[in-house]
UniProtKB/Swiss-Prot annotation:
Residues 233-507 are lumenal. It catalyses: a long chain fatty alcohol + a fatty acyl-CoA = a wax ester + CoA; an acyl-CoA + a 1,2-diacyl-sn-glycerol = a triacyl-sn-glycerol + CoA. Pathway: Glycerolipid metabolism; triacylglycerol biosynthesis; Lipid metabolism. One of its GO terms (biological process) is triglyceride biosynthetic process. Keywords: Acyltransferase, Cell membrane, Endoplasmic reticulum, Glycoprotein, Membrane, Transferase, Transmembrane, Transmembrane helix. GO terms for cellular component: endoplasmic reticulum membrane; plasma membrane. In the N-terminal section; belongs to the long-chain O-acyltransferase family. The lineage of its organism: Eukaryota, Viridiplantae, Streptophyta, Embryophyta, Tracheophyta. Bifunctional wax ester synthase/diacylglycerol acyltransferase. Involved in cuticular wax biosynthesis. It comes from Arabidopsis thaliana. This is Wax ester synthase/diacylglycerol acyltransferase 5. The gene is WSD5.
Length: 507
């Protein structure tokens, strides 16, 4: 009897040890392995402006109480060779938070605000050339005692993309913040109504039409969805094989080398102006952002082509039939998950973490329009057509299939070729609607972006309170004047707003 009990206890102990080992070691997901391939060694970087002076001890203690509870932030990357096959795992380790918090010594007494902005841009750009140390978890926080034109001090968060996508990271960072009006409350995001093509439209149709016509409409909608998805799939395949964008002044010839220096700048505009246009044109914020971006890119290219052909300065300068497409990132999660991530760090609960993003190949219509509202209408028409497709889901699924069948290196080559044949990346994230604090430090703006992928231009938009921050990550050898692109974006927004106000007042 004793022998049986001992054996059973031994089995229980062995099972417990196995379970602990499994919890201590986690294999990298296929997407995480992809982000460690040389062609896709991507990093997420976020510049956070703070309203008050940084107190490093408060931030370090806050990180210990929050981020350290998340397994990805307390695990390091380990490469093992098993039967001549390389295996990558996340292995839990003891983290010394102070080693991840970097406080550079800056001689600020002779730096004015304008020069401080240049210093910050140079500092962040230099970070893009320095890889993270793989002997410890792949994240770091830089605390800069630097007063800029729009912040008292600045924090810079740098995280390897294999830890999760932009939505994961943004939600996680927001889960570490609190409302300034109520320090015990998590920030809230604006409600996003995502009506499915099913429920509400089907109910309305069933009231208005007979069942026969209702069935015809359902079949027609399904047929359009399938047709659009097939067309988008064929375009993606063609792009991966041979279909290239026009060689414009903003398209890099990207054989992205390791440690390539990227330049990062940002500009903040009023979100109220975006909403004014949105309400007048009966669009979404994303529609307006896409339309203004299309107008801004057209203005910027007009100048660049004019510089190349000074003799034609009085003409439109822009060649006809430009193919300029963006890889538009789409979050595939049903919810943003701030509460789930906060629970994860306090209770150990699980939520959908990792890289859950798909791509849409979005064609910008580059042209000069007498009526700036044409850019809005064209952008809305294009994105509405893309919404009636499963392209984002398809690219996510195909990416996983390629990784599982071809392996990381070959899949990286295919995806790298597809992205290299487009011109730029584009993403838009929704932020908190009220003022928040980051470990006791009031936040003035959030400017996230990503680098390491084969694009000379990445445009990222982040809303916060009543502001919208535009972050540009550019290859300075291709786009040497990113601030002028920001100027063109801002001027396009202003001109569209003026036209909208004039037409609204005359109605």
């Amino acid at each position: 009897m004793e022998i049986k009990i001992r054996r059973r206890r031994g089995q229980i102990a062995e099972t417990t040890v196995k379970k602990e080992v499994e919890e201590e070691e986690q294999p990298l997901s296929p997407a995480a392995r992809l982000f460690h391939a040389p062609e896709f060694n991507c990093y997420i970087i976020s510049v956070v402006g703070l309203k008050n002076k940084i107190e490093p001890d408060m931030i370090i203690e806050g990180i210990k109480q929050t981020l350290m509870r998340h397994p990805r932030f307390s695990s390091k990357l380990v490469n093992n060779c098993n039967n001549n096959r390389q295996e990558q795992k996340w292995v839990r380790t003891n983290v010394v938070v102070e080693d991840h918090v970097i406080i550079p010594k800056i001689q600020t007494q002779h730096i004015e605000n304008a020069n401080a902005d240049v210093f910050l841009e140079s500092y962040v750009s230099d970070l893009t050339t320095i890889p993270l140390d793989t002997s410890k978890p792949l994240w770091e926080v830089h605390l800069l005692d630097l007063k800029t034109s729009d912040a008292e001090n600045v924090a810079v968060l740098r995280i390897h993309h294999s830890l999760g996508d932009g939505m994961s990271m943004m939600s996680l960072v927001l889960a570490c913040t609190r409302k300034t009006s109520n320090p015990n409350e998590l920030p809230s995001l604006p409600y996003q109504n995502r009506p499915s093509s099913g429920s509400s439209s089907l109910k309305t149709s069933s009231r208005c039409y007979s069942r026969f016509f209702w069935l015809v409409m359902v079949l027609w909608s399904a047929a359009l969805l399938v047709l659009n998805t097939v067309c988008d799939a064929l375009e993606f395949i063609a792009t991966a094989l041979f279909l290239k964008d026009t060689e414009t002044p903003i398209k890099g010839d990207f054989k992205l080398s390791k440690g390539k220096r990227m330049c990062m700048v940002h500009r903040t505009v009023s979100l109220d102006d975006i909403k004014l246009i949105k309400n007048a044109m009966k669009m979404t914020v994303n529609d307006v952002v896409l339309g203004v971006s299309q107008a801004g890119l057209s203005q910027y290219l007009k100048r660049r082509y004019g510089e190349q052909e000074e003799s034609k300065r009085n003409s439109s300068n822009i060649p006809k039939g430009i193919r300029l497409r963006a890889a538009l990132l789409v979050n595939l999660r049903p919810t943003t998950g701030i509460q789930d991530l906060a629970d994860m760090m306090t209770k150990g609960s699980k939520c959908r973490w990792g890289n859950w993003i798909g791509y849409i190949i979005f064609p910008f219509s580059i042209a000069l329009c007498d009526d700036p509202l044409k850019h809005l209408r064209r952008a809305k028409s294009t994105i509405d057509r893309k919404k009636n497709s499963l392209e984002a889901v398809l690219t996510f699924v195909v990416g996983k299939i390629l990784l599982n069948t071809l392996g990381v290196q070959r899949a990286a080559n295919v995806l790298n070729r597809a992205l290299s044949n487009t011109t730029m990346s584009f993403s838009n994230l929704v932020g908190p609607v009220e003022e928040i604090s980051f470990y006791g430090h009031t936040v003035t703006y959030i400017a996230p972006s990503v680098y390491g992928h084969p694009h000379a231009l990445t445009m990222h938009f982040q809303s916060y309170m009543n502001k919208l921050t535009i972050s540009l990550t550019v290859d300075p050898t291709v786009i040497s004047d990113p601030h002028k692109l920001c100027d063109d974006w801002e001027e396009s927004l202003r001109s569209i707003k003026v036209v909208v106000q004039e037409r609204t007042s005359t109605q």
